[in-house]
């Protein structure tokens, strides 16, 4: 199979939405029957985002094969059916790590290792390998043109453009076209300078996607075309919209997919965007609203919970309600108590690391349990629910996780001492182990208890979900917790590890050790999130009565 490559760059400012634009184009091409994948090349020196602060970088998206990746891969999976893997995201740090490892082994036969050709060759190899088996591979280059960190990646795709030829490569550049209120017009000069910068390193864009708060007038498109040496039909206006799921139709209406297909000489059907039209209709026509309190510790940056936010919205679509997320700092719960949890239709406690704010999450679980409020715990959200239950129901007053209190008399949650690395090797973990790459990661089979809410949600006796954690429920206390009324509704493939818990005599109190948000999509939703929002809606209706 001959793979075609679309390289996506960004200029003027960061956060223009390259990932959303790339994913939206991929969605249109997929709707035309093409097999599409998307890659993200990140210029930072970290080997992967696994140890980066969520408040700086946003969430870490985990792929099925256990790679810790950029949150943009979450966008990719929500827009197209192709599942991402570790070949879809790599960083400057990973490239340098692999090149230096080869140098230490002597693979380069004593050559002087340089950015060109050794680093650029390694990047090109990754890009070509990631595109294998697909009709089209869209490659997003992180950062902004002009950043020193991005230069090796830009040089690599420049070389690929020459080596593969125009019939297999296309360069798409996102820029900002701001509107100046004082002048009463949009300004194209930033775009002109951005394209000039890109051309100075040898890349001539074939398509310009112009971001702004409004559509670009035809005369300004003609001006951009003239000064940037791009066909006028290849100047695409991408205005702000109230839903990112409208963007595929917006790009389709301007013929971007036709331009790509013609450029690559591909024969394929017209795009069928009916599934996306249905998503947009559901989003615009809810029959009600629910308020979900998300009790977390990284709430100053909503992108830290990007997939959870989107999964809640998807569940709202399936239940025909709009979901309003109320972000609640878990430390605020510690300081003010239950008053900050009033007026909610459900509580969700997402994952997290470290002791800060954990008691606030435990209080949130207690409030939901005692007030029959729908509760959904994810990863740490399951662990705090179990700790709360152990303390206040099962008679273990000082129960805790050894992550937060190594001297607790009731360590109901403890460190996993054995794990499997990305190469499939069994490794031993201890307190001094590295933080990076030492977690239980990726898709794992989970057996579900017959008759449980989990089994009802999944409509079956098993599921496969993605994990990212290094602490588990301590089996020593399982029997005591079960006797107190806790249901262990999900177990690992070998039935040795607890994956899900529920509570008897509660409308909907469900928690999982895994991260179901990573597999939720706007077209398909996710059964656990759907069940949670359905329970929140039912709780609201009971309150109204």
Swiss-Prot record:
UniProt binding sites for L-glutamine: 352, 380-383, 403, 470
Native source species: Shewanella baltica (strain OS155 / ATCC BAA-1091)
Pathway field: Pyrimidine metabolism; CTP biosynthesis via de novo pathway; CTP from UDP: step 2/2
E.C. code: 6.3.4.2
Residues at which CTP binds: 14, 147-149, 187-192, 223
Gene Ontology MF terms: ATP binding; CTP synthase activity; glutaminase activity; identical protein binding; metal ion binding
Annotated residues for binding of ATP: 15-20, 72, 239-241
GO biological process: 'de novo' CTP biosynthetic process; pyrimidine nucleobase biosynthetic process
UniProt function note: Catalyzes the ATP-dependent amination of UTP to CTP with either L-glutamine or ammonia as the source of nitrogen. Regulates intracellular CTP levels through interactions with the four ribonucleotide triphosphates.
Residues annotated as binding UTP: 14, 187-192, 223
Major enzyme class: ligase
Note: CTPSs have evolved a hybrid strategy for distinguishing between UTP and CTP. The overlapping regions of the product feedback inhibitory and substrate sites recognize a common feature in both compounds, the triphosphate moiety. To differentiate isosteric substrate and product pyrimidine rings, an additional pocket far from the expected kinase/ligase catalytic site, specifically recognizes the cytosine and ribose portions of the product inhibitor.
Protein name (Swiss-Prot/TrEMBL): CTP synthase
Keyword Glycoprotein: no
Region (Amidoligase domain): 1-266
Description of activity control: Allosterically activated by GTP, when glutamine is the substrate; GTP has no effect on the reaction when ammonia is the substrate. The allosteric effector GTP functions by stabilizing the protein conformation that binds the tetrahedral intermediate(s) formed during glutamine hydrolysis. Inhibited by the product CTP, via allosteric rather than competitive inhibition.
Record keywords: ATP-binding, Glutamine amidotransferase, Ligase, Magnesium, Metal-binding, Nucleotide-binding, Pyrimidine biosynthesis
């Amino acid at each position: 199979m001959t793979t075609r490559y679309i390289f996506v760059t960004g200029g003027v400012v960061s956060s223009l939405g390259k990932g959303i634009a790339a994913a939206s184009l991929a969605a249109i091409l997929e709707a035309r029957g093409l097999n599409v994948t998307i890659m993200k090349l990140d210029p930072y020196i970290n080997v992967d985002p696994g140890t980066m602060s969520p408040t700086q970088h946003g969430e870490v998206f985990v792929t099925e094969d256990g790679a810790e990746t950029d949150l943009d891969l979450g966008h990719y999976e929500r827009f197209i059916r192709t599942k991402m893997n570790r070949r879809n995201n790599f960083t400057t740090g990973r490239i340098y790590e692999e090149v230096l490892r080869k140098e230490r082994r002597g693979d380069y036969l004593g050559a002087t290792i340089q950015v060109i050709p050794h680093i650029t060759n390694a990047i090109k190899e990754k890009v070509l390998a990631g595109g294998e088996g697909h009709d089209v591979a869209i490659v997003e280059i992180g950062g902004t043109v002009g950043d020193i960190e991005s230069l090796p990646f830009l040089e690599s795709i420049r070389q690929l453009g020459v080596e593969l030829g125009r019939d297999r490569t296309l360069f798409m550049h996102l820029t900002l076209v701001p509107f100046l209120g004082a002048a009463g017009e949009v300004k194209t000069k930033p775009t002109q300078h951005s394209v000039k910068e890109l051309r100075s390193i040898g890349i001539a864009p074939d398509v310009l996607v112009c971001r702004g708060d409004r559509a670009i007038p035809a005369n300004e498109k003609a001006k951009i075309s003239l000064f940037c040496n791009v066909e006028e039909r290849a100047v695409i206006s991408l205005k702000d919209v109230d839903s990112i799921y409208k963007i595929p139709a917006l790009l389709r209406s301007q013929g971007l997919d036709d331009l790509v297909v013609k450029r690559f000489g591909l024969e394929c059907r017209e795009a069928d965007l009916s599934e996306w039209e249905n998503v947009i209709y559901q989003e615009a026509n809810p029959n009600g609203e629910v308020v979900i309190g998300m009790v977390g510790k990284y709430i100053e940056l909503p992108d830290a919970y990007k997939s959870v936010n989107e999964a809640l919205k998807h569940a709202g679509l399936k239940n025909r309600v709009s979901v309003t997320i109320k972000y609640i700092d878990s430390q605020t719960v510690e300081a003010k108590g239950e008053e900050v949890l009033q007026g909610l239709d459900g509580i969700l406690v997402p994952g997290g690391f470290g002791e800060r704010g954990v008691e606030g999450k435990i209080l949130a679980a207690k409030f939901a349990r005692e007030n029959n409020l729908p509760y959904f715990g994810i990863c740490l959200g399951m662990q705090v629910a179990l700790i709360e239950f152990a303390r206040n129901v099962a008679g273990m007053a000082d129960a805790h996780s050894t992550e937060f209190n190594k001297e607790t008399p009731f360590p109901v949650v403890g460190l996993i001492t054995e794990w499997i690395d990305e190469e499939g090797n069994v490794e031993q973990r201890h307190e001094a182990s590295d933080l990076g790459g030492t977690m239980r990661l990726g898709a794992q089979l989970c057996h579900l208890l017959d008759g449980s809410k989990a089994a009802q949600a999944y409509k079956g006796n098993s599921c496969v979900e993605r994990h990212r954690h290094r602490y588990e429920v301590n089996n020593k206390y399982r029997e005591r917790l079960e006797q107190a009324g806790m249901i262990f509704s999900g177990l690992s493939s070998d039935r040795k590890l607890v994956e899900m818990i529920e509570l008897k005599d509660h409308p909907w109190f469900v928690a999982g050790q895994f991260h179901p948000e990573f597999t939720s999509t706007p077209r398909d939703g996710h059964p656990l999130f759907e069940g949670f929002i359905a329970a929140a809606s039912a709780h609201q209706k009971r309150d109204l009565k």
